[in-house]
């Protein structure tokens, strides 16, 4: 429609591929500028409103237990005028929602193939550990192999969890099949299963001290992960968002 309206070719068509022409590139850059200007205008207007739009942050269930309770409480004590809404999603889904502007930020496991699409701040370098009841037969081991874990009844997180993908790949590379009896994003439910002494799950090592009666066993071949905050490249950062980043 734009090509007809302006009488120019915006795309170069070769087979099933579309590429921007010189005119198309110029129009694209101007469109990006206009959209950013609209975002800035909206932010300026929002700052004068009595009700400010909240900053939307995506956070996986596991990470919400470690990072955000204290951080959010401290931030809101210092900046009570800035509303913040936390929304629970796995890291994969959270990144997708940041990309389409549904979320402003997301706290995620950064071991994803497309993580370079986002701006990021790394908050922690951690590892995945195998978690069992302190009375489980494996609880005293210094490390646990994939073969040993494959003999246990396992609880994995949901499909939109990066941790899930990393673990499945590890089992596959080691020629083992995990015995997954449940997939859940609910920490409390998972802990109840673990405390029955019959099941195992996978948490980040920084989490285990927060749960009584649970032991985190390092994997024989560690799976290390970086945890950080991501936001969309090229996105206009409002004053409230910048304050939160700072």
Language model features with spans:
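Flexible hinge/capping segments at coil-to-helix
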Residues: 117-128, 132-154, 238-242
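Central regulatory/effector-binding core of bacterial HTH transcription factors
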Residues: 52-113, 184
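Hydrophobic hinge/microswitch elements
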Residues: 90-91, 95-102, 109, 162-215
């Amino acid at each position: 429609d734009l090509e007809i309206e302006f009488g120019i070719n915006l795309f170069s068509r070769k087979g099933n591929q579309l590429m921007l022409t010189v005119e198309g590139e110029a129009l694209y850059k101007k469109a990006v500028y206009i959209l950013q200007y609209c975002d800035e205008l909206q932010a300026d207007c929002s700052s004068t409103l009595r009700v400010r739009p909240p900053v939307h942050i995506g956070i996986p269930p596991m990470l919400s237990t470690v990072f955000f309770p204290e951080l959010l409480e401290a931030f809101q004590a210092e900046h009570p005028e800035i509303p913040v809404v936390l929304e629970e999603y796995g890291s994969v889904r959270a990144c997708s929602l940041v990309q389409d502007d549904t979320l402003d930020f997301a706290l995620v496991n950064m071991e994803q193939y497309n993580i370079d699409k986002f701006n990021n701040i790394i908050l922690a370098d951690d590892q995945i550990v195998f978690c069992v009841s302190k009375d489980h037969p494996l609880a005293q081991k210094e490390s646990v192999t994939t073969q040993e874990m494959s003999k246990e009844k396992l609880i994995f997180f949901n499909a939109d969890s990066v941790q899930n993908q990393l673990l499945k790949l590890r089992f596959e590379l080691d020629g083992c099949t995990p015995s997954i009896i449940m997939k859940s994003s609910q920490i409390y439910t998972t802990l109840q299963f673990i405390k029955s002494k019959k099941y195992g799950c996978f948490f980040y090592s920084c989490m285990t001290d927060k749960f009584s009666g649970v032991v985190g066993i390092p994997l024989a071949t560690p799976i290390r992960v970086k945890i950080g905050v991501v936001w969309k490249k090229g996105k206009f950062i409002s004053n409230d968002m910048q304050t939160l980043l700072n």
